């Protein structure tokens, strides 16, 4: 019996070494080896005589694993393989579509660019006629086959799906899996903000504008639709990269003045973003600026009283000295939209407290001073 057990374990060991496993499988190989070895050992203790023709090994599958190791394996699977695993049988399907597995993938890939407004828009999208299942609004579920057909572009693993067995199933519309796949396939346009819109056009350097975004998995970039400017058509930009996108830091409409709550605490050297629009028909964008010193101040921090002044200087140092865009004055006590049709209109202000946000603006700094 011991010889039989030794031969079996060694055969399994050398066979597993010869296989080429995906990255996630290498992390679970030891777990599976331990479980199967334990299974063989415990069964050998109960057998009086060896049964070389026993079909136990041939019938064993991943479903024979206890819940804990099985869940650990599923948590290591990438989204495309989770979808494939969900088609194996009904038992695995229930596990593979559960929210707790997909929430990790959603947060890892999409968390930094999905803000509260995106989640609100998703709920509206589910009940809109633009949803995938809108022609059949009587049902509240999407077929798994339809979802997987949308995921085929994610991985070549789906190219042979027609030769695999199909299981009827459904996924709740409000599930995290549905949310992830709708983002991944570009079916859902979500709200976010884009740095340096329109491919870094000189007129938008060091700005961030609201947009609706759709992901293109083939290029790993986004298509952006910007709010219309008055009677102008919606501006569309393609090939927007991940690093140019952020979730909106504040819940403010691009057409409304943001109510500032930090004006009294601002002092020279603070980094801020301020709303600005070309005219009343344009939406606001957020522009990077630094609080400067008053003309009457020599800049010596030991004697500076600028933070006590009713007026506040904002500097846009990406523009050359003497440019009309270089500086502007804001009344911190009675702040409201300020400007004219020639210089544009300045709106609400928010202080930047996050070092990562400040570093992002610095990385976007133009290579040459603007006029």
Curated annotation (Swiss-Prot):
Source organism, top-level taxon: Eukaryota
Family matches, as SUPFAM superfamilies: F-box domain (SSF81383)
Pfam families tied to this protein: F-box
Residue intervals of the F-box domain: 59-105
Gene3D superfamilies recorded: 1.20.1280.50
PROSITE patterns membership: FBOX
Organism from which the protein derives: Arabidopsis thaliana
Protein name: F-box protein At2g26850
InterPro entries: F-box-like_dom_sf (IPR036047), F-box_dom (IPR001810)
Coiled coil region boundaries: none
């Amino acid at each position: 019996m011991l010889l039989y057990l030794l031969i079996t374990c060694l055969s399994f060991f050398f066979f597993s070494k010869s296989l080429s496993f995906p990255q996630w499988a290498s992390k679970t190989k030891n777990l599976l080896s331990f479980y199967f070895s334990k299974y063989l050992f415990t069964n050998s203790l109960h057998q009086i005589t060896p049964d070389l023709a026993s079909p136990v090994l041939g019938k064993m599958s991943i479903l024979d694993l206890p819940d804990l190791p099985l869940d650990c394996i599923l948590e290591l699977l990438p989204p495309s393989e989770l979808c494939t695993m969900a088609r194996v049988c009904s038992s695995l399907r229930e596990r593979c579509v559960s929210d707790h597995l997909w929430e990790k993938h959603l947060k890892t890939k999409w968390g930094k660019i999905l803000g509260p407004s995106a989640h609100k828009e998703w709920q509206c999208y589910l009940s809109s006629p633009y949803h995938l299942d809108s022609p059949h609004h009587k049902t509240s579920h999407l077929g798994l086959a339809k979802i997987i057909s949308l995921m085929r572009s994610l991985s070549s693993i789906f190219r042979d799906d027609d030769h695999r067995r199909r299981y009827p199933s459904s996924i709740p519309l409000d599930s995290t899996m549905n949310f992830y796949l709708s983002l991944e396939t570009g079916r859902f346009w979500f709200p976010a903000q884009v740095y340096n819109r329109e491919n870094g056009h000189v007129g938008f350097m060091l700005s961030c504008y609201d947009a609706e975004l759709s992901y293109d998995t083939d290029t790993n970039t986004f298509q952006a639709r910007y709010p219309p400017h008055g009677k102008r058509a919606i501006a569309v930009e393609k090939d927007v990269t991940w690093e140019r996108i952020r979730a909106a830091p504040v819940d403010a409409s691009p057409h409304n003045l943001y109510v500032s709550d930090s004006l009294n605490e601002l002092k020279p050297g603070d980094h801020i973003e301020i709303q600005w629009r070309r005219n009343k028909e344009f939406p606001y964008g957020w522009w990077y600026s630094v609080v400067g010193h008053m003309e009457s101040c020599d800049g010596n921090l030991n004697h500076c009283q600028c933070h006590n002044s009713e007026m506040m200087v904002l500097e846009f140092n990406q523009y050359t000295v003497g440019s009309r865009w270089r500086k502007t004055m804001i009344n911190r006590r009675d702040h409201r939209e300020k400007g004219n049709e020639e210089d544009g209109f300045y709106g609400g202000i928010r202080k930047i407290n996050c070092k990562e946000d400040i570093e992002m603006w610095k990385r976007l700094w133009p290579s040459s001073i603007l006029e």
